[in-house]
Amino acid sequence: MKNTKLLVVVDESRATKRTLEYVAQVASRRQDFRVCLAHALPSPPPEQVEFRGAEKARLRAYKRRWISVVEMAEQRALDRANTILRRGGLAAGAIEAHYCYLVDATRATQEILRLARSRKCDTVVIGRKSLSWLGELIHGDPAEELVRQGKGITIWVVE
């Protein structure tokens, strides 16, 4: 039987918790399911992207600290997601986790789909109300954008 690999987009929302519980219910105790957790990281503030002259070293240090703080917070979200899936019955070996760096918010859904393809995921799973910060940036629903752009990939939107 063919393995099924799900890319689950996670954040700190209640929608993500419901999504993870649903995925655990569907995928637990099934040898042919693998789950790839993807946490979308927002891009650094613009003032950290542009380096100028003498400020260059100071801005690099500031950017490293910002990335470190963001990654620690996001790692906690991935750890919580992993815990929900494990409690739901998935084996540790069936779960992997990745960051998805969203350099340009207008291409965020494309970046998520690119990660799904690179990790060889058949399906992308997202909560209806997940990634609210991204919805504000793209002036729309990230789940709907994934459905619209996800040609060739199955998209599950969990209410």
Language model features: what each stretch is:
Residues 144-159:
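Short, flexible loop segments at boundaries between secondary-structure elements
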Residues 1-63:
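Small/aliphatic-rich secondary-structure junction motif
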Residues 7, 34-36, 96, 123, ...:
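A structural signal for isolated positions on well-ordered beta-strands in alpha/beta enzyme cores
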Residues 2-3, 106, 123-148:
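Glycine-rich, Arg-bearing micro-motifs that act as flexible, cationic patches
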Residues 1, 83-123, 144:
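Structural beta-alpha unit
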Residues 59-76:
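A short acidic, glycine-rich active-site loop
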Residues 28, 117, 148-151:
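Solvent-exposed polar/charged
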Residues 22, 73-85, 111:
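Short, solvent-exposed amphipathic alpha-helices that sit
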